[in-house]
Amino acid sequence: MANINLKEITLIVGVVTACYWNSLFCGFVFDDVSAILDNKDLHPSTPLKTLFQNDFWGTPMSEERSHKSYRPLTVLTFRLNYLLSELKPMSYHLLNMIFHAVVSVIFLKVCKLFLDNKSSVIASLLFAVHPIHTEAVTGVVGRAELLSSIFFLAAFLSYTRSKGPDNSIIWTPIALTVFLVAVATLCKEQGITVVGICCVYEVFIAQGYTLPLLCTTAGQFLRGKGSIPFSMLQTLVKLIVLMFSTLLLVVIRVQVIQSQLPVFTRFDNPAAVSPTPTRQLTFNYLLPVNAWLLLNPSELCCDWTMGTIPLIESLLDIRNLATFTFFCFLGMLGVFSIRYSGDSSKTVLMALCLMALPFIPASNLFFPVGFVVAERVLYVPSMGFCILVAHGWQKISTKSVFKKLSWICLSMVILTHSLKTFHRNWDWESEYTLFMSALKVNKNNAKLWNNVGHALENEKNFERALKYFLQATHVQPDDIGAHMNVGRTYKNLNRTKEAEESYMMAKSLMPQIIPGKKYAARIAPNHLNVYINLANLIRANESRLEEADQLYRQAISMRPDFKQAYISRGELLLKMNKPLKAKEAYLKALELDRNNADLWYNLAIVHIELKEPNEALKKNFNRALELNPKHKLALFNSAIVMQESGEVKLRPEARKRLLSYINEEPLDANGYFNLGMLAMDDKKDNEAEIWMKKAIKLQADFRSALFNLALLYSQTAKELKALPILEELLRYYPDHIKGLILKGDILMNQKKDILGAKKCFERILEMDPSNVQGKHNLCVVYFEEKDLLKAERCLLETLALAPHEEYIQRHLNIVRDKISSSSFIEPIFPTSKISSVEGKKIPTESVKEIRGESRQTQIVKTSDNKSQSKSNKQLGKNGDEETPHKTTKDIKEIEKKRVAALKRLEEIERILNGE
């Protein structure tokens, strides 16, 4: 076995770098979104064991909607990327490029088993630059192919060392081969096919058998005229070990998918659901299509599903000629490779094996796959193609007549392939560029029109997105997903009538209800979202809530394990004020997915509605944060529950969670505001001031932050600093009653501006004539103005509003005594005492605001059809409402203030009585 040298490695790595360096500037596109951005298995908070329970896309293998692609080792490398750079795509693309270089170098070593040094380097160069590999290398999810190929080739190289002197068996390389096959299979399923290549290598290369020799030996043995040679028995033992190991891996793999194949729609692979002979003719035609992509990769497309390749429905279809030609050529090469024993036939045989065997899982031979053509599955088969081309070039270049021409042609192929690969990488820069490049190749694929629409939709360009979605419905009128996309876009454009019509059209395309029929086997999971989307749309109308609930129940009846339907129904039931039923829906969803942080969060909201804050906090919010320590809504709202509980011991944890929240959401003023409220509760006035100012800096019109900052200044003897804050508050909210009361108090007591205070109290009564606090304070203003008769009338009106308030009656009696004695010379109410009459004037314990902005309950929505509908659920009370819970300490403080107010009232009464 020839070794590879440093020059060859440098050449290969340099060529790979030159072709793929621009891929470092591409983002996450197409399948990368599901496998990387939306895959929670990448997050450090997800237990490692979960990687071995979920499929490649992060869906539990036990779920019917799972793709059943089991590649935990590939996901593990994604997780390592995430650990190093989180979701920055450059590191992911860099590692892919490195893996491709490694594969190319190992492939060079494999080539030297069958080709001379020069041809081996050429084959490796052809492989390194082939444009068909851009999907596998530049698309991050193509790493499954890259990793699997590394262990695929390593397993084969290990097996080539299993033959010892005198044809003896060396078991260590065989054991290593089995291990590497298992690893390759855990990277991608096609890794297991290397066992077939090892078997072919053992029989036809290592032992040098040909088909005629095998037939002769078998015939003699069956006729009893001879025995099986010992070397052949040894070969048989090795083959049995390989086959048994393979069978064991297959059994384990079947157990992993729980003997279930993934559910695909007829749009994913139209031929798979077509009748005979359409299915067979089309499947066979796909073989020359794939071969042509290897031979002429000029028109590449990221998606070959739906109507990309029309079905072959007749034997008279001209495309059958391509199928016939392909099989003739393949047959001739096959006969040549297994009939003759020369080096050339061995090279051709191994090339054909590398082309054919790894392609079998994607060939629809044993089971239908979810695509028509996929360029990245040609990554390993292209190795055999490159060996075949290099071997052919070797044969031609040895003839002096064609030597120069062969070098020119080879150089042109490598150069053009390199340029094509480099240019093709730019198509993968973004989803929009990728799908637009695909539409240049194929305009009959509705999925491509949909995907361009999705790319524009992500940019909030709904008008343009709608055009592409509508075109998708024209290209494929029975595409349920396209009509759902149209409906969602109409909804985003606030055209609800058209949105409902589109959803109804999609719903009409769903299979009709058949009693006793199991729908899970016939309906793609994402298509059931039409019921969810339609229900989410119509439930905006309060009169149609029952109709929406019926849609959710219909979806559940079709798929009892449809988690999203339970989640959405639970949200609706909360809106219908049925928290107990909502709780049942969420608990059912939790039975299907107990590791969903959003579900635990939603259940916490239900317990809040049921007035069970302790249950919400201890069991649900905390569980959500165990599963996802960065769950923003759980961090925020659990902190609010702790704060509102009034338990001093919970305040440090509430503060910790709010600090984590602002770390995740640094631009949300609510986090800073609630930190300020916690600081006020802890009497940390300076800290509270800092947090409130930060909240106001982020949101200048933050009603609650403005008022509570002014209140803080008022409580800390900084009334004059409170005044400009109140002016700002009343500029945004001129009807803010408590702000007007506080402003009037400061104007009366600090600024001695009786007229300004009077305007504040009069403004309050314009908005709320029955406001006792404002009315009484206005009476005090009249008293200060020495208008006793007006003060008397005012107090009478106030007493009518609050007949049980004794202090109003006493003040009325005092005023009447003053009128009757006619001894009114100077102001009887000292302005410095006004704000404390009976504790009714700006009682600080009753004006603290506990919430600035309502928060949203995040409801998990199925993302297959990019449904983004969310529902609001307010936690806590609005900004001007009083604190709902008081601790014993708070109550004592309030009582102290009330007693102090009574003492001040006695002082006022003594002054009124002339004492």
Swiss-Prot record:
Just give the chief location class.
Answer: membrane
The residues on the Extracellular side of the membrane are 30-93, 188-193, 253-317, 375-376, 424-915
Alphabetically ordered keywords of this record? Disease variant, Endoplasmic reticulum, Glycoprotein, Lissencephaly, Membrane, Phosphoprotein, Repeat, TPR repeat, Transferase, Transmembrane, Transmembrane helix
Q: Membrane topology type, per the record?
A: Multi-pass membrane protein
Where found, per UniProt?
Answer: Membrane; Endoplasmic reticulum
The UniProt entry's GO biological process terms, in alphabetical order, are: positive regulation of proteasomal protein catabolic process; protein O-linked mannosylation; response to endoplasmic reticulum stress
- Where are its TM segments located? 9-29, 94-114, 121-139, 140-158, 167-187, 194-214, 232-252, 318-338, 354-374, 377-397, 405-423
Q: Where is there biased composition of kind Low complexity?
A: 865-874
Instruction: Give the main EC class.
Output: transferase
Q: Does the keyword Acetylation apply?
A: no
- Reactions catalysed, as given in the entry: a di-trans,poly-cis-dolichyl beta-D-mannosyl phosphate + L-seryl-[protein] = 3-O-(alpha-D-mannosyl)-L-seryl-[protein] + a di-trans,poly-cis-dolichyl phosphate + H(+); a di-trans,poly-cis-dolichyl beta-D-mannosyl phosphate + L-threonyl-[protein] = 3-O-(alpha-D-mannosyl)-L-threonyl-[protein] + a di-trans,poly-cis-dolichyl phosphate + H(+)
Q: GO CC terms for this protein?
A: endoplasmic reticulum; membrane
Q: Which residues are glycosylated?
A: N494, N541, N865
Please name the pathway: Protein modification; protein glycosylation
User: Where is this chain compositionally biased, Basic and acidic residues type?
Assistant: 878-892
What disease is mentioned for this protein?
Answer: Lissencephaly 8: A form of lissencephaly, a disorder of cortical development characterized by agyria or pachygyria and disorganization of the clear neuronal lamination of normal six-layered cortex. LIS8 patients manifest delayed psychomotor development, intellectual disability with poor or absent speech, early-onset refractory seizures, hypotonia, cortical gyral abnormalities, and hypoplasia of the corpus callosum, brainstem and cerebellum. LIS8 inheritance is autosomal recessive.
Cited function: Transfers mannosyl residues to the hydroxyl group of serine or threonine residues. The 4 members of the TMTC family are O-mannosyl-transferases dedicated primarily to the cadherin superfamily, each member seems to have a distinct role in decorating the cadherin domains with O-linked mannose glycans at specific regions. Also acts as O-mannosyl-transferase on other proteins such as PDIA3. Involved in the positive regulation of proteasomal protein degradation in the endoplasmic reticulum (ER), and the control of ER stress response.
From the Swiss-Prot or TrEMBL record, give the protein name.
Protein O-mannosyl-transferase TMTC3
- Where does this protein come from, organism-wise? Homo sapiens
- This chain is encoded by the gene named TMTC3
